[in-house]
Amino acid sequence: MSRVANNPITVPKGVEVTLGDGIAVKGPLGSMSQPMSSDVTVALNDGVLTFAPVGSSIQANAMAGTLRALVNNMVQGVSKGFERKLTLVGVGYRAQAQGDALNLSLGFSHPVVHKMPAGIKVETPTQTEIVIKGIDRQAVGQVAADVRAYRPPEPYKGKGVRYSDEVVIKKETKKK
């Protein structure tokens, strides 16, 4: 059995899990659902979710671990939420949140406007910091990666958009 699927998920107070054709999770921050694989059986007993593969195939084991990880992310998302912080490094690089869009000045001849998908909120505490929040871990990470892709950190001066916890390894300039 998958080592990930061996760990049961304890459902926190205020979070409601419903099993049916799929798994629906409802909490204080919102609700999410995930279709269930026929290779995995899910049981809910006294606020504890357990996952077990049907049969002993490699695919069933893998699906059990994958489904457990996805459901755990859903439970965390609807109870606490997820956030990703980005930092802008460079002269004149600025960010400004306007409703459901993010306005970026990244040294191009035009401002870059990035629309946020449904369920994702963006804040700019300062002009060089961006905080992306939401209940869907995958969507938060994808939006952060999309924003970073406009101007990834370059290896000589480190200018660009980077994750706040990212370490940019700088190269030495060419010597004569």
Swiss-Prot record:
Subunit record text: Part of the 50S ribosomal subunit.
Organism annotation: Thiobacillus denitrificans (strain ATCC 25259 / T1)
GO CC, alphabetical: cytosolic large ribosomal subunit
Family note: Belongs to the universal ribosomal protein uL6 family.
Role played: This protein binds to the 23S rRNA, and is important in its secondary structure. It is located near the subunit interface in the base of the L7/L12 stalk, and near the tRNA binding site of the peptidyltransferase center.
UniProt record, GO biological process: cytoplasmic translation
Sections of the chain in a coiled coil: none
Sorted UniProt keywords: Ribonucleoprotein, Ribosomal protein, RNA-binding, rRNA-binding
InterPro entries to which the protein is assigned, alphabetical: Ribosomal_uL6-like (IPR000702), Ribosomal_uL6-like_a/b-dom_sf (IPR036789), Ribosomal_uL6_a/b-dom (IPR020040), Ribosomal_uL6_bac-type (IPR019906), Ribosomal_uL6_CS (IPR002358)
Protein name per Swiss-Prot or TrEMBL: Large ribosomal subunit protein uL6
GO molecular function per UniProt: rRNA binding; structural constituent of ribosome
